[in-house]
């Protein structure tokens, strides 16, 4: 459909990431270079207990294959810390997986029992204070990776789909192809439009930019 300029899909389970879908990330240029690919944990024994049906190395291989066909692809994921039976080494395995892959963002949570699931009947529970410490450590690593990625975008020009008014007067908020939130001083008539924007600032949570004009081009030259 020619009128569709950008395509995203919400998420994919690693076990469903077959060769055809991997190739699509290289072949379909309208498919945005951001993929939410949940892994949940790093050690294989925890992945097995979660019934994830993939290993940590299989996850790494999928990421490597995707980056071969789309080198600019960035990843988001989900993590659960403190799953029953998780040891200090298991947690370190998760941290190493994060270091190996490098994520642009992630959703992370402490394990809590869900009635009706096999894990709800497990007895080798992790102490609450240990879960909290592990979650803090994991979130700090993800935040550092996200900030590094955002900083690497400063000075670049990116296409932004403006979605809504920002919090400040005259400000719009949009999304980059990498799904980063970006705030730009711009006319609200641009909401719903895809516009070239120069990234001028970066924080851990969002970017700041300015609409690319002939004047801004001269300024950055």
Where are these regions (language model features)?
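Flexible glycine/acidic-rich beta-alpha junction loops that bind and position SAM and/or redox cofactors
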Residues: 16-20, 39-50, 81-88, 104-129, ...
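Conserved SAM/AdoMet-binding glycine-rich loop
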Residues: 1-88, 99
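Short beta-alpha junctions and helix-cap segments that line functional grooves
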Residues: 21-22, 94, 184-185
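Short, hinge-like loop/turn segments at secondary-structure boundaries
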Residues: 25-26, 94, 123-126
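Aromatic/hydrophobic pocket-lining residues that form the small-molecule binding cavity
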Residues: 59, 91-94, 131
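Conserved, mostly hydrophobic/aromatic
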Residues: 9, 37, 78, 98, ...
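Terminal RNA-binding accessory module
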Residues: 120-221
């Amino acid at each position: 459909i020619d009128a569709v300029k950008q395509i995203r899909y919400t998420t994919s389970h690693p076990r469903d990431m077959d060769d055809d879908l991997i190739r699509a990330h290289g072949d379909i240029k309208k498919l945005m270079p951001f993929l939410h690919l949940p892994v949940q944990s790093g050690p294989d024994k925890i992945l097995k207990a979660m019934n994830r049906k993939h290993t940590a190395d299989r996850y790494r291989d999928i990421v490597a294959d995707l980056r071969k066909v789309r080198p600019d692809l960035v990843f988001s994921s989900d993590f659960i810390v403190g799953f029953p039976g998780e040891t200090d080494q298991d947690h370190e395995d998760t941290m190493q997986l994060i270091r190996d892959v490098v994520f642009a963002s992630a959703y992370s949570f402490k394990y809590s029992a869900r009635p009706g699931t096999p894990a709800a009947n497990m007895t080798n529970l992790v102490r609450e204070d240990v879960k909290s410490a592990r979650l803090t450590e994991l979130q700090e690593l993800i935040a550092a990776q996200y900030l590094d990625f955002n900083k690497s975008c400063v000075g670049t020009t990116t296409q932004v789909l403006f979605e809504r008014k920002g919090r400040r007067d005259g400000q719009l908020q949009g999304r980059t192809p990498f799904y980063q939130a970006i705030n730009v001083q711009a006319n609200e008539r641009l909401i719903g439009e895809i516009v070239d924007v120069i990234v001028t600032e970066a924080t851990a949570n969002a970017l700041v930019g300015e609409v690319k004009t002939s004047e801004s081009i001269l300024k950055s030259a």
